[in-house]
C-alpha cells in the first residue's frame, strides 16, 4: 500500500506561518501547532465534527474507538476551523495569517469572526 505524502503547518516563534503542499496533521501535531494539550485538541476536533463544520481525512489511516471510527489525520479545513475555536497565542497568530491570506485583514471583519468564535465555544 502506497503511503500518501502529507505536510504540516509550521509556525515559528516570531509568528511566521508556513503552509506547503497537501496539509494533513495528526491530533498531536495539531496540539503542538496551537500550543495546547492533546486532550483539548481532540475535544475541539470532536465538537467541530459533531457540528458538521469540518471532517477529518478518511482516505488515510483511521483509528477505531469502540464502535466509532475516527480519522488519524485532519486537513486545512479542520485546522482553520480550530484556529477560530481555540484561544491560544498560536491560534491567534494563525487567525491573523488566514485573514491576511484571505485579503480580509480589515479589523471589522476580524471583530465579526471573533464574535462568531464566541458562539462556537
Show which residues each predicted segment covers.
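Residue-level detector of alpha-helical secondary structure
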Residues: 29, 44-47
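Positively charged, aromatic-accented nucleic-acid-binding surfaces
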Residues: 1-29, 33-38, 63-121
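Short, solvent-exposed alpha-helical "recognition" segments
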Residues: 46-57
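Key DNA-contact positions within bacterial/archaeal DNA-binding proteins
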Residues: 39, 43
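Short, structured secondary-structure boundary patches
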Residues: 45-46, 60-64
Amino acid at each position: 500500500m502506497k503511503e500518501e505524502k502529507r505536510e504540516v503547518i509550521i509556525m515559528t516563534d516570531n509568528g511566521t506561518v508556513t503552509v506547503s503542499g497537501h496539509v494533513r496533521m495528526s491530533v498531536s501535531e495539531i496540539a503542538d501547532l496551537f500550543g495546547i494539550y492533546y486532550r483539548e485538541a481532540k475535544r475541539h476536533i470532536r465538537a467541530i465534527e459533531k457540528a458538521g463544520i469540518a471532517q477529518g481525512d478518511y482516505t488515510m489511516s483511521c483509528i477505531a474507538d469502540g464502535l466509532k471510527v475516527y480519522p488519524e489525520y485532519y486537513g486545512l479545513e479542520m485546522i482553520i476551523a480550530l484556529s477560530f475555536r481555540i484561544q491560544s497565542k498560536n491560534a491567534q497568530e494563525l487567525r491573523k495569517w488566514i485573514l491576511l491570506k484571505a485579503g480580509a485583514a480589515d479589523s471589522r471583519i476580524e471583530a465579526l469572526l471573533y464574535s462568531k468564535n464566541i458562539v462556537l465555544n
